[in-house]
């Protein structure tokens, strides 16, 4: 069953009289980062209208569930191959929890399992769950673990659009993401403007220098924009030494709660930026080693600052240099120019 047909008939997609208990069961895999799970949120939320959805992801999925897809179930599991280093130290893998997780999932008797990642490890995991239908993007022979393989979208396609293609195969309509050029304000603010500025990122190669973020804060404050400054734990002392009040959330739930009071987000190419976009906040994201066409936050009014050219881009955070030139060469003036346009559209 590797053809291009939809699974709508195979899994008996619901009509208007069906209840949650007799909806088909859908297993969604997104083992990787906060940003990846936030990008999947539109698909997950839409899928709950047609399926009993279970999401397998890292534990912060429990924080996202009530906020972004309240009708989905969560099974938290940390896939060892998502570690940045030592991912194939098999002697350190949680074999017992892997066995328990797969046993639990097999007991659910899923009608469909899906992954939007071009990853044979996901496909093997789906095969072990014994889901009746397994849908994904095959690679290196992993089509043997799938019942439906989907051709990869064009190289320049956004990561969000892989979820759109998965949705097409199982009868879940998730529109393709297309970034829009924002040239004028479309809605007025009903409260004083407040903007999140988040200076952290999952990896150091994605962290724009803090002294440059400080200049952004100074400009925002001069423009009468209230700033909620958020940083990662290791950055806190620097900000406090520069007399800035800073918030260091202890969980994804705390991060989301803090951002609820804001109308826009400014930060690095990071999970918090994708979370902000999923929450409906327009984003201005400063990129370095990653490709913006793949991973810009999927808010239609979002803006990006492109990192400098590098022959190794994208390096997937494995920078070959002592410092990431692609990010270091993004000047304060370059970001300020974008920030002023961003504020005019979204915070004035």
Protein language model annotation of sequence segments:
Residues 1-348:
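Catalytic machinery of carbohydrate-active enzymes
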